[in-house]
Structure formats: structure tokens, C-alpha cells
Amino acid sequence: MCSQLLKTQSPVSLRLFFLTQLLSSSILVWESTKATTKSKFVQDCVKLAYGNDSSVVREDRFAGVPALSGTGACRLFAEFQRRFYPDSQMFLPMPTWSNHHDIWRDSQVCTRTYHYYDPGTKGLRFQALVNDIKNAPDRSFFLLHPCAHNPTGVDPNYEQWKEISHIFKIKNHFPFFDMAYQGIASGDVERDATAIRIFLEDGHLLGCAQSFSKNMGLYEHRVGCVSIVSWDDKQATAIKSQLQRIVRAMYSSSPVHGPLLVSTILNDADLKALWEEEVKVMVDRLISMRITLRQTLEELNSSSSWEHITKQVGMFYFSGLSPEEVNHLQRDFHIYMTNDGRISMAGVTRSNVDYLASAIHEVTSVNNSNCIDSKHFEFVV
């Protein structure tokens, strides 16, 4: 059985398998140390997001609890916001991950949107974003994607984050960062935390949702954390007690297996280095496929500009394809994506990138005399 496993497992899943087996041998110990394990996990999450040398970490100025991945972390914060800031709203970027709207709506927190993406340039609509932040009521709540914005893959640069932080400070806004892709934007987990650390350096109180579904491949383990930065350790203790009350009524207790996997990796120098190396390998492949897709489209002499493919970062390529073009790809080429044109770059490989590029070229060519007759492709795959 072991030899069969060695033949079929990928390097990442094989290492995770052996680590899981190692931890499984200690399952009886876990049962007696769940509270300690989860407390350590929260510490590890906060250090990863805020930095080992952050004053927030040194002074224990944070409240945090394990959550059921990123969705659970956002849901906990939304409930916290509803209970203690009942008249507040959450400003969401337009567009954002569709589940954000459902999470805050189900928590009975009103949502509004702020400008973010420019369909014309397929880039950041920065000045409109800044204006919306300035025009929002003082002390508003804003959800921010610190890296690898979902679905657009468009992130502010360092100077833009500094300006955003400055305006937040003037307006006394509260930033809530949903960090589902730390490491997936640049291949460097430290670099991808830059936005959050800019806000911390500027003295903001803030909230953060973290998920290890993508960067550690622990999707089915539902491993996440929500943390809130406070003025002092006493306030942090009070906030934590309220978060724990919400957890108790919502799902009582989170699993311990996933958090222990994360803590084991983050506290072992060799394992952490291996993890960071594998994240970079994964991101390098995504970048490589972006370059290949762009080059292939440009070689087809497309009249469209495709530079946004390589300017965007993260798992997704926000293509800018219209709903009609998306439907055309599905109907005639059996290429599937979300209706807003978001393509998962993880599904693009060297064996299918030419086909994908040709199909995109076909549906975006206005006067293409070689358009495929859809009647010839009426079959189910």
C-alpha cells in the first residue's frame, strides 16, 4: 500500500500525508490539549499576518479565535459587528468575492460598495476608490483584500496602500482585511502581508480573517482565524470573550487537527522553509502560465490588449469577457468559468493553454470569418 501511495501522491500531498500520519499518532494527546493547541494556533496566525516583530504581538494587543476557514472568520466578524456596532455598514469593493455579500447580509449588516476595478483599463480605479473612502461617513467599516484580490487579481501598490491607510486614519475608518491568499500573490508570504503591516505601522485598529485553504492546501480541514487589534491587552481580553461567546452559539468549537497541522509547520524551521518554497513554486507556475497565455494570444494577432493577464496576480485571471463571450466559450468550446469571466489559472496547463487561447481569440474576434458553427458542437462533456 505504501509503494502504491508513493506512486500516486504528488510531492505536496505526500509530505502532508506523512505529516498527518505523524500527528495522528498523537491524537490522544490532542484531546487533553485542545485549548492550548488553539491558543498557540491563534498566536501563530497573528505572527504570520502581523509580523513576528509587531508591537501588537509583543504587547498582546489582539483578540483572536480559530474559525472555520475564511468564510467562518468573516462570518464571526460580521456577527461581532452586528452586535456591537448595530448601526454600522460594511463597505465592500466592487467587485468582490460574491460570498462577502451573503455573509454580511445573513448577519443582518447592511452593505454598500466602493469603486475598485476599472473594466476599461482592467486595472485599479484608484482615484474613485480614494474618493469613496473620503466620502464615506466617519468610522465606517471597510473590507479590504490585502493581496490577490478575488476576483480581479488587481492589487494596490505600496504607495497606494500608504495613501489608503492615511485617508483611513483621517476618517477613523475601521479596516477589515480578508486574507485568503497570503503568499499566492507574490510567492512570498511576508511580502503579501505588506498592506496589513502598513496599517499597523500607521497605528490603526483593524480586523483580519485568515484562511489556509489555498496556501497550505487544507481546504477540507476548514482552517482559519479571525483576529482584532485592540488598544491594549485588557480590551483584547474583553473582545476575545465576546468572540468566544459568538463561537459557542454558532458552532461551539472548531476542529483541532487542521490548526495543529498549521502550527506544526509554522513552528518547525525546516517545515516552514519547505512550505514557503512550495508556495513559491506554485506561484511561479501560475505566473508562467499567465505569460504563456498572454504570449499565445498575442501571437494570434488579436486586436485586443492582453497585458492585464500578466499584470494581475494570484489564482485568478479576470478576463473581462462579457457574459455572452463566456457563454460562447461554454457552448462551443466546453471551457467553463464564472459568469463574470473569472478564470482559475490553476486549471491552465501547458497541455491546454493553446486551446484556451485559441478559444478566447475566437470569441473576442469581432470580424472573424473562421468562427466555428456552434451546431457542429452540440454534445455534452
Task: Describe each model-derived feature in a short phrase.
Residues 1-34, 40, 44-47, 249, ...:
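N-terminal "arm"/small-domain region of PLP-dependent enzymes with the aminotransferase-like
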Residues 22-172, 182-184, 189-201, 321-322, ...:
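Conserved core of the PLP fold type I
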Residues 60-61, 308-314, 338-342:
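Short Gly/Ser/Thr- and Asp/Glu-enriched loop/turn motifs at secondary-structure junctions
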Residues 111, 175, 206, 336-337:
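Hydrophobic beta-strand scaffold residues
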Residues 119, 154, 189, 214, ...:
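Hydrophobic alpha-helical scaffolding
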Residues 179:
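Walker B catalytic acidic pair
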Residues 201-279:
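Conserved core segment of the aminotransferase class I/II
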Residues 274-332:
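Conserved PLP-binding catalytic core of the aspartate aminotransferase-like
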